[in-house]
């Protein structure tokens, strides 16, 4: 069998029809699977010694979220090292990265595999992989025919990456430097909300504006901050992180602005604060809403005038710092309640970003699950970690109040449980490996604790226990926010919860 001119023309036409790179890539992969009559095909991008799926056909959806590190996938490493078509024999001892990931064929091993490395000049930029269940599935195609396919795919991928590079550098084609893959933090997700967020990150990254990142606990606000920094002109300088919720009031000012020797008991030497460390770079202030009003005033001055004073020093230091702030609270409500300065809010929220909760991201949950499965596979030295159809269905229908962080922990826990129930280095995650609660907390009246046959102390503790549970649920298990809601000190709340058996 050989390719006709019509077949090649059809592939080229499909590459031009798509609206946007993602659509073009998907059309290419779907067309290739039809033309080559294979069971699965994938277009992968090469970045930092790993292959990142861009488009798939015939494979489980979670493959799009996986990141295939070369050291963990010898077949993909062989493709990356090759300069030409790679055909793996049916009896190859090298494990196939897609074993168990072809829907309906989970228990079978892939038999035929062809890899086509894709180049832009001398640079490896990606690969095409073709898989089939029959050992001789690709024998009818010559290497020359497969090279033509690779050339078309390489051209499409190279153009897409070059456009991405030009857009990130805000350059015109005539000013382009030699092709170089753009390395940025991977934001996994193809849902409309995540697509819009990625566009907004691209827009604001090129500027020097302060950014306020809002979103529920566990949605990935720190990852957004990293993506902004890495795509900004400040990327060559440090990104400094500070969790404002973990700052004791007594040392908060020193952490932010530094101190001089002798400024207070224990200040045995001069020390730079986070603003100095982030000079010419970016400072990420996580949980900005936890700062006291006094510190908010000092932070505002830095944003206004660009100078800081170390604790115990009368001299001012000039700093050039871009501030990215994150919060899981509604700062507008905090301003109205008098807990957050309006002028600081407006300084920080020049360009606000909102990270969508996982329950609003549709199929992104499966992509993220695939990413975490691959992480577990590498960490535990397993040959494969795959999700059963029932497990995928369960993940798609659970609302994840803890968002991406809860999903990550659920996958890691499920892998450990699944591994304990079977021998070997292959793990299949079933629905029973996930211990998701059937229902959320009932309404207060249904959850009221009866006091019949209870003494006063028992009734009081039961009431305290239920009140703390409800406060935590309403504040997404943020202890500091729950303490404010209950009008108590967060340290006292932790101690009370421990005494009541609500935490270890």
Curated annotation (Swiss-Prot):
Pathway: Nitrogen metabolism; nitric oxide reduction. CDD domains: AAA. The keyword ATP-binding applies. The modification 4-aspartylphosphate is found at residue 57. Transmembrane segments: none annotated. One of its GO terms (biological process) is phosphorelay signal transduction system. Residues 479-498 bind DNA. Keywords: ATP-binding, DNA-binding, Nucleotide-binding, Phosphoprotein, Transcription, Transcription regulation. Gene3D superfamilies: 1.10.8.60, 3.30.450.40, Homeodomain-like, P-loop containing nucleotide triphosphate hydrolases. ATP binds at residues 215-222, 278-287. Pfam families: GAF, Sigma54_activat. It comes from the Bacteria. GO terms for molecular function: ATP binding; ATP hydrolysis activity; DNA binding; DNA-binding transcription factor activity. SMART domains: AAA, GAF. Residues 187-416 form the Sigma-54 factor interaction domain. Required for the expression of anaerobic nitric oxide (NO) reductase, acts as a transcriptional activator for at least the norVW operon. Activation also requires sigma-54. This is Anaerobic nitric oxide reductase transcription regulator NorR. It comes from Escherichia coli (strain SMS-3-5 / SECEC).
């Amino acid at each position: 069998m050989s390719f006709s001119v019509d077949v090649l023309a059809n592939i080229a036409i499909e590459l031009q029809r798509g609206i946007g790179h993602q659509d073009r890539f998907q059309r290419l992969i779907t067309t290739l699977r039809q033309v080559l009559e294979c069971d699965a095909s994938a277009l992968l991008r090469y970045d930092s010694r790993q292959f990142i799926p861009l488009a798939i056909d015939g494979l489980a959806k979670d493959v799009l979220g996986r990141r295939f590190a070369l050291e963990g996938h010898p077949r993909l490493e062989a493709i990356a090292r090759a300069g030409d078509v790679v055909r793996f024999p049916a009896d190859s001892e090298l494990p196939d990265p897609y074993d168990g990931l072809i829907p309906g064929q989970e228990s079978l091993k892939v038999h035929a595999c062809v890899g086509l490395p894709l180049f832009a000049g001398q640079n490896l930029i990606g690969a095409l992989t073709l898989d089939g269940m029959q050992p001789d599935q690709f024998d009818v195609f010559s290497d020359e025919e497969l090279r033509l396919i690779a050339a078309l795919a390489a051209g499409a991928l190279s153009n897409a990456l070059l456009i991405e590079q030009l857009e990130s550098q805000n350059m015109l084609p005539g000013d382009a430097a030699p092709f170089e893959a753009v390395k940025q933090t991977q934001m996994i997700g193809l849902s409309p909300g995540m697509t819009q967020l990625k566009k907004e990150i691209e827009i604001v990254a090129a500027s020097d504006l302060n950014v306020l990142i809002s979103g529920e606990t566990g949605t990935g606000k720190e990852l957004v901050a990293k993506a902004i920094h890495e795509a900004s002109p400040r990327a060559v300088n440090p990104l400094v992180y500070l969790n404002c919720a973990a700052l004791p009031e007594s040392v908060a000012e020193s952490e932010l602005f530094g101190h001089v020797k002798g400024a207070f008991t224990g200040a045995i030497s001069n020390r730079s604060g986070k603003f100095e460390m982030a000079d010419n770079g970016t400072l990420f202030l996580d949980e900005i809403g936890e700062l006291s009003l006094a510190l908010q005033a000092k932070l505002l001055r830095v944003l206004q005038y660009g100078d800081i004073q170390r604790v115990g020093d009368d001299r001012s230091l000039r700093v050039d710092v871009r501030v990215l702030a994150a919060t899981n609270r509604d700062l507008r409500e905090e301003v109205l309640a008098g807990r957050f300065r309006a002028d600081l809010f407006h300084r920080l929220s020049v360009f606000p970003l909102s990270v969508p909760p996982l329950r609003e991201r549709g199929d992104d949950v499966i992509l993220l699950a695939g990413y975490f499965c691959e992480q577990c596979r590498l960490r535990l030295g397993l040959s494969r970690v795959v999700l059963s159809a029932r497990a995928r269905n369960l993940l798609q229908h659970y609302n994840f109040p803890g968002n991406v962080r809860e999903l990550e922990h659920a996958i890691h826990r499920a892998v450990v449980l699944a591994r304990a129930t079977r021998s070997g280095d292959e793990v299949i995650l079933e629905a029973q490996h996930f211990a998701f609660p059937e229902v959320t907390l009932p309404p207060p009246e249904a959850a009221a604790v009866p006091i019949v046959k209870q003494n006063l102390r028992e009734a009081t503790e039961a009431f305290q226990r239920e009140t703390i549970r409800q406060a935590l649920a309403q504040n997404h298990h943020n202890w500091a926010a729950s303490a404010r809601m209950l009008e108590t000190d967060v340290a006292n709340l932790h101690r009370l919860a421990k005494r009541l058996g609500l935490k270890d």
